[in-house]
Amino acid sequence: MKIKDLKMGDYFTLKPIAEPKESQVYVRGGYCKSDRKYDCNRFDDINACRRFPGDKEVFVDFVF
């Protein structure tokens, strides 16, 4: 699944992990028009923000 297909607030991981730790789970945020990327924060640390392009492949099939 691509990051642009997720809704704001959806959880995802960057690798296919069956039972990820809190530090491996990201929350999709809003879209930054100037960078043309999506803001995403780590679940356990809201200050750990990363921006990903819309075609970034992410994984949502995990138990959390």
Language model regions located:
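Intrinsically disordered, low-complexity regions enriched in serine, threonine, proline
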Residues: 25, 39, 47-48
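Short, solvent-exposed secondary-structure boundary/capping segments
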Residues: 34-43
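Intrinsically disordered, low-complexity, charged/polar segments
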Residues: 45-64
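A broad helix-preferring feature
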Residues: 9-11, 40
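Mixed-charge, Lys/Arg-rich low-complexity intrinsically disordered regions
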Residues: 1-7
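Short beta-strand-centered aromatic/proline hotspots
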Residues: 21-34
